[in-house]
């Protein structure tokens, strides 16, 4: 069935270069830390209906029937961005190079389909629709080519409260206006400042 949702994607920028410069055990630990922390942050939200991992990309689908729910997804993005700051500190301490990420967010209708083969044990919920594709596309622009870490669609921006709108600036992406920001979670940032010196 169709439902209005907000999709968020986060992936590591330049991950193919990371595999070239790191040994496999180190790479596995770094990816495991990144993926598990992203999943934990998304999974902690009651509105999160689905989390998927594709390579170095983690994406979630959030049930957002109210505008305040969309603001909550922005706070998830801020937590993800703050978590990367902490993870980079841990990587620096071990003399590993830091990682950077892109986060893309969009809102719209998605088709939820249960797909698989009966009796095979493969019977997953699949989320399809422009909102999922668009959030993935925005993620691929975020954190690259002078873009800030978080890129959101105009639909997401227009549904945010005034405070959250003030955290983003607009830019033109062809004929479309997008919004970008580098927002953080204040309490996580305070913890970072106290513990990561």
Q: Where is each model-derived feature located?
A:
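Catalytic/regulatory signature loops of cyclic-dinucleotide turnover enzymes
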Residues: 106, 130-155
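Short helix/loop segment flanking the catalytic signature motif in cyclic-nucleotide metabolism enzymes
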Residues: 23-26, 53, 57-98, 105
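Short beta-strand elements
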Residues: 45-53
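Switch/connector loops and helix/strand junctions flanking conserved nucleotide-binding motifs
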Residues: 111-115, 159-162
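Juxtacatalytic helix/coil linker segments
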Residues: 1-29, 36, 40-45
